[in-house]
Amino acid sequence: MSNSLNSSKYQPLTTRQGDRIAVVSGIRTPFAKQSTAFSTTPAVDLGKLTVKALMDKTDIDPKLIDQVVFGQVVQMPEAPNIAREIVLGTGMNIGTDAYSVTRACATSFQTTANVVESIMAGTIDIGIAGGADSSSVLPIGVSKKLASTLLALSKTKTVYQKLSLLRTLSLKDIAPVPPAVAEYSTGISMGQTAEQMAKSHGITREEQDALAHRSHTLAAKAWKDGLIQDEVMTAFPEPYTVWLDHDNNIRHDSELASYAKLRPAFDRKYGSVTAANSTPLTDGGAALLLMSEKRAKELGYEPLGYIRSFAFSAIDVHHDMLMGPSYATPMALDKAGISLSDLTLIDMHEAFAAQTLSNVKMFASNKFARECLGRDKAIGEIDMDKFNVLGGSIAYGHPFAATGARMIIQTLRELKRRGGGLGLNTACAAGGLGAAMVLEVE
């Protein structure tokens, strides 16, 4: 155990019998840009596709799965409990427990943590965690005026009464209402927050574009070198006329100069955040199979790796709302009993290049550590040779609830290729939330 952190905060994630919690396997759909390959596939179907592929890949007896915890950020009213629909749609035992959670962009870190805690408590032996989201199949709402009028119409008895109510509606009242993109509590969007963070922390347009170019270049190389294919299923969504076996957002011919051509997306005059240095709206799903180390051995599985620790944070939503990794990571490192320098790999969710680079700066800031974290010194400067080595969300895309599981799968597989070690996954999330998880591979 490292002496550089407070060892009194070390919290081993084990069962009562001392078994670690193993990630036996993981899989995901290809991630598709909004309105492309999965344009008519709702999140619940993406979730079913993913979990069924995971069950087929591991050849697990469906009766052995005790629990499914799944997430969806953009909720569909007709299927509010995506986890239960997945159980019912994939051939699992009808008695399999299932519930859904949401933690914005950190959702599948939360579903993983929930399954880990259930295994530690002894309430389940085997669980599936993950998430799916569609930015193409969205719940399009109606105005409050139209909603109240439709309700009143259902209670009228005469044609005159109905017409009288309908006359009160304007064209604005009957226009569709798309899902909100701004924070409910502040009215500030994620993109606006990224702009604020770029200005507050001195992140230049050139630095943001360089990170985006790096992300695409590394992701393209990872696919070209055959490092990603085995964790991505071939998806045949209904009506089964097309299929997809790769992420379709990655720029395989990325050129740094091309990024400078785009106009800022959120602050047209003075901004630096563009569509190219931000993660795109994306469709996809990802899932993990978890169980105790002992149970994995009994069933003949060789685990991908183990969950060493996790931590979640919550901060103010008015300023630096996407700084969650800088708050959650020190807690996760403490709970794992390690320091930043002990890590073999660091994978940070790239919601925006500005947000990512702001967090990278704060990891190394003693001032931030003292004033915001109450710590004597910073956790340390990130070794960029360890950072997002296969590219990040700017390249792969970001189906909100699936990103955490993608990162876990990708990091564990890369650690195994490197002969083992410790990896950090961390993400910001809407609402000022953050997540960090330490992974271990022998």
Curated annotation (Swiss-Prot):
Keywords, alphabetical: Acyltransferase, Cytoplasm, Fatty acid metabolism, Lipid degradation, Lipid metabolism, Transferase
One matching Pfam family: Thiolase_N
Cellular component, GO annotation: cytosol
GO terms, biological process: fatty acid beta-oxidation
Pathway in which this enzyme or protein is active: Lipid metabolism; fatty acid beta-oxidation
Presence of the UniProt keyword Secreted in the record: no
InterPro entries in the record: Ac-CoA_C-AcTrfase_FadI, Thiolase, Thiolase-like, Thiolase_C, Thiolase_CS, Thiolase_N
GO molecular function ontology, one term from the record: acetyl-CoA C-acyltransferase activity
Catalytic center residues: C105 (acyl-thioester intermediate), H398 (proton acceptor), C428 (proton acceptor)
Superkingdom of origin organism: Bacteria
Recorded catalytic activity of this chain's protein: an acyl-CoA + acetyl-CoA = a 3-oxoacyl-CoA + CoA
Protein EC: 2.3.1.16
Subcellular location: Cytoplasm
Role played: Catalyzes the final step of fatty acid oxidation in which acetyl-CoA is released and the CoA ester of a fatty acid two carbons shorter is formed.
Family: Belongs to the thiolase-like superfamily. Thiolase family.
Subunit structure: Heterotetramer of two alpha chains (FadJ) and two beta chains (FadI).
Record-given protein name: 3-ketoacyl-CoA thiolase
Species annotation: Aliivibrio fischeri (strain MJ11)
Lineage of the organism: Bacteria, Pseudomonadati, Pseudomonadota, Gammaproteobacteria, Vibrionales
Gene that this polypeptide is encoded by: fadI
